[in-house]
């Protein structure tokens, strides 16, 4: 039973959240969560919520690809140590993906992001479009990535969202086959890294430290008593946090996968939802789920009836014989694939990251 004090707190909290979101600029929504199961059953899921088609396709990227940070003459340069399967945005950015070592990277919208001013003279630049790819190319584990990123080897360079007059503002989440997790944000021009296995959930606004504080309140109430039900980021964070801990910790990988899919669907926004008074809420266009142990990358579009997967274990990622390949998902990701779609990838010319 909820006492009067809790009811008052709930009312105040709701009012604060409503006021905060009402003043926020238009933003897009996504959710990411990590399931920590027994016997190494680690599963990461994310939803992509966006107001229009992000022209997503899936790509196989082998090791050995030489890349530039696409930030002008003073760009960071590297060669991919690991192969990866990625989901692109507009085929000019990596929005989501997993490498052959089991590291997953996801970028989600965060309107509060403020990146250091890039002058082209000090540290080399890295286009925000390749931020996730840099992690996938260079690191096998979250700990390894965090150790390197703490040294700040580059400066993030952002640009406008394609077709829009606003800057791209993102934060990055990493998870690996051990269940380790990290959230990387840029707040007031400074990099902030939250690194701990317990950081299983990430959504959008507010910043991650504030999300944790709000979630602590809901944990005190208890998810079996009441959970916030709107599509707002803070509510999705609370629901995802409760359910990813509450679902059975299955040794059976397929049952664990079913539970994780049910959670990421629970925090998805109905397709076609248009709420003029809540412009920060957008439809879920697709979902991805990674089984880190079995190295399977699942993809589910809102506009097709099937969930399909890519089996990283069967892919030639070698620098010598591996090939860049693309799975064409079609407009609004409406091409239908079923089961193991790995053989359906076709040889393709490597896409170029959007940069300066």
Name the predicted role of every residue range:
Residues 142, 146-184:
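Aromatic- and glycine-enriched pocket-lining scaffold segments that form the walls
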Residues 23-29:
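Sec/Tat signal peptide C-region and signal peptidase I cleavage site
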Residues 43-45, 104-107, 173-175, 183, ...:
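Structural recognition of the beta-strand scaffold that forms the well-ordered cores
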Residues 10-22:
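Bacterial N-terminal signal peptides
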Residues 29-43, 67, 157-159, 165-169, ...:
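C-terminus-biased signal that marks the final domain/tail of proteins
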Residues 29-123, 156, 338-339:
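A contiguous strand-loop segment
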Residues 60-77, 114-154, 322-333:
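Compact, glycine/acidic-enriched structural inserts
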